[in-house]
């Protein structure tokens, strides 16, 4: 009995039903609930697993490099980045007939291949890689790092190398090491790589291990650094006629503030990027020396937080008690980390397309669309996870005595006001936005488009103008050519910025109108409603008017019977579950908006977006239906084409998505009866009755069925849109 899964829970291991398997999987990572767990073992297990995570990441990235070097066309892509399609890897599929082989043999390959829409070619090219040998070297190095990480993980599980709890809770040392060591030193090292390898490569000079000690990154070497004439490093930048990867039109500057984009590659100037990383390195190296460790100087986090008591008295005891609450709660720390990471991931999505850092990536439209969508979805899952762990913190780790009258306690005390205000904002946004869309729909349907309600986003246009966009005619700040801000800026900073903002061939400050105004508010509705559900779930996790003792039931309970006026669907888990649907819905609107706006921009028919995006039928007909034609046409009487795989994935995604509803809209009794019937039939059928269950089959619990349904819904939803996005974009701009 002792060796049955799950080893971490004797109670579950002895369960005679299939519940043993499902609950075992569900609680495998909930270390806190495992048998014989101590605080020390909890911290040590998590710490060791981080090394495993790093090993997987290094192995994965190593695999990317290896497969491109082995099966890709990196060297021929480097010769002509705009016209050669980058190959991710070869496809070996015994089912392929001749038409399929022909359809997927692309990019100069000898057999069927996958095209890379991840941007890795552009990235590797920008940072100075040029040959397959470079890629193999990188793959081997990352494989080595992966092995080192695995060894480190194993090592930190050995008794002699297990860190103590006090080491894990030493906040100041961890801050110093992460700020200086992780961010500071790595940013400085990256600046070094850009200056010593990437910038010379962009000027046609190859710097490798055999010559990097002989090649000066700047004609004057370290002279200007030691004499304080740092401005010399910014003089003689690459000219606007510079051909990337060659010496033609190249300069000698290494750290600049040019602003705008390299005219040929449409990406940020590499010398600007190096300068940025140097500044980041400086800030973080300083920040990593601010906290008090063994030397008795610097800040103590506890003293800092305890001193944060606003004098007006309107925030009570301010941050008193927060240090211990955060430092003793892994869920609090994880929640904060996920919230920050989620926001950063969304910012990455926004900045990768508007300020592209990699050479030629802005002209690879499918990659731009794929990267934006990918990062927004990742951000959504990470952000909802932040609230999930926030709710678990409130249930498991929050101590009311420790936090009396501080900001955390006051949040919980006036939660009704927070929830009702969020609710009001969501209702207001929803009804007004839908009202405008539907009104416009009706006007179009009745043939009177001039009666639409079209609102210009004047405040957003004013902000764009203040930053230098002249087309709206606001004549304010940087868009006012006679103003002091404009004149001062010409000589000091970012001369290329104003050109970039006012050029229509990039995605920086796109021209916006009534369609943007409407979809902006639709997205605002989605964001506020998602937030409402998540915030309510966390704030009510310990108890609500209906169920004051909710915290005793844990994070994910389905119901507490029929009493109390109905206690089903009110656990913190239920809030998370509902919020994920809203999150997916919202990101759907975000990505639809981004994609349609950009397709019309790239095709040169922005008027289609401007005219059709002001009413719902326009979105359904001119975006979704019009752009799914390639997918619906993936297989036709003329045989297959290179979009067929996406057509199949589009169908398959819908299937997975629809399967989710089977778990989401059903009664447990039905499933139990179905399972009993299947088991009965199996046991009475020759051959099938040779296989016997050791566990009695039981239906999934309510919470489990919802999780399975949600997983199918999410995966199907994202698969379907990914296929739509890639096929419709690559079909137009192949």
From Swiss-Prot:
GO BP terms, alphabetized: photosynthesis
Cited InterPro entries: PSI_PsaA/B, PSI_PsaA/B_CS, PSI_PsaA/B_sf, PSI_PsaB
Binding site for chlorophyll a B1: 654
Enzyme kind, highest EC tier: oxidoreductase
Pfam families given in the database record: PsaA_PsaB (PF00223)
Any single Gene Ontology cellular-component annotation: photosystem I
Entry's localization field: Plastid, Chloroplast thylakoid membrane
Membrane topology label: Multi-pass membrane protein
Family matches, as PROSITE patterns: PHOTOSYSTEM_I_PSAAB (PS00419)
Membrane spanning stretches: 46-69, 135-158, 175-199, 273-291, 330-353, 369-395, 417-439, 517-535, 575-596, 643-665, 707-727
Residues annotated as binding phylloquinone: 671
Highest taxon in the source lineage: Eukaryota
Ligand binding ([4Fe-4S] cluster): 559, 568
Cofactor note: P700 is a chlorophyll a/chlorophyll a' dimer, A0 is one or more chlorophyll a, A1 is one or both phylloquinones and FX is a shared 4Fe-4S iron-sulfur center.
Keyword Iron-sulfur: yes
Catalyses which reaction(s): reduced [plastocyanin] + hnu + oxidized [2Fe-2S]-[ferredoxin] = oxidized [plastocyanin] + reduced [2Fe-2S]-[ferredoxin]
Keywords, comma-separated and alphabetical: 4Fe-4S, Chlorophyll, Chloroplast, Chromophore, Electron transport, Iron, Iron-sulfur, Magnesium, Membrane, Metal-binding, Oxidoreductase, Photosynthesis, Photosystem I, Plastid, Thylakoid, Transmembrane, Transmembrane helix, Transport
Record-listed E.C. numbers: 1.97.1.12
A Gene Ontology molecular function term of the record: 4 iron, 4 sulfur cluster binding
Binding site for chlorophyll a B3: 662, 670
Function: PsaA and PsaB bind P700, the primary electron donor of photosystem I (PSI), as well as the electron acceptors A0, A1 and FX. PSI is a plastocyanin-ferredoxin oxidoreductase, converting photonic excitation into a charge separation, which transfers an electron from the donor P700 chlorophyll pair to the spectroscopically characterized acceptors A0, A1, FX, FA and FB in turn. Oxidized P700 is reduced on the lumenal side of the thylakoid membrane by plastocyanin.
Family according to the record: Belongs to the PsaA/PsaB family.
Stored PANTHER family: OUTER MEMBRANE PROTEIN, OMPA-RELATED, PHOTOSYSTEM I P700 CHLOROPHYLL A APOPROTEIN A1-RELATED
Self-association state and partner proteins as the record states: The PsaA/B heterodimer binds the P700 chlorophyll special pair and subsequent electron acceptors. PSI consists of a core antenna complex that captures photons, and an electron transfer chain that converts photonic excitation into a charge separation. The eukaryotic PSI reaction center is composed of at least 11 subunits.
Protein name (Swiss-Prot/TrEMBL): Photosystem I P700 chlorophyll a apoprotein A2
Species for this entry: Atropa belladonna
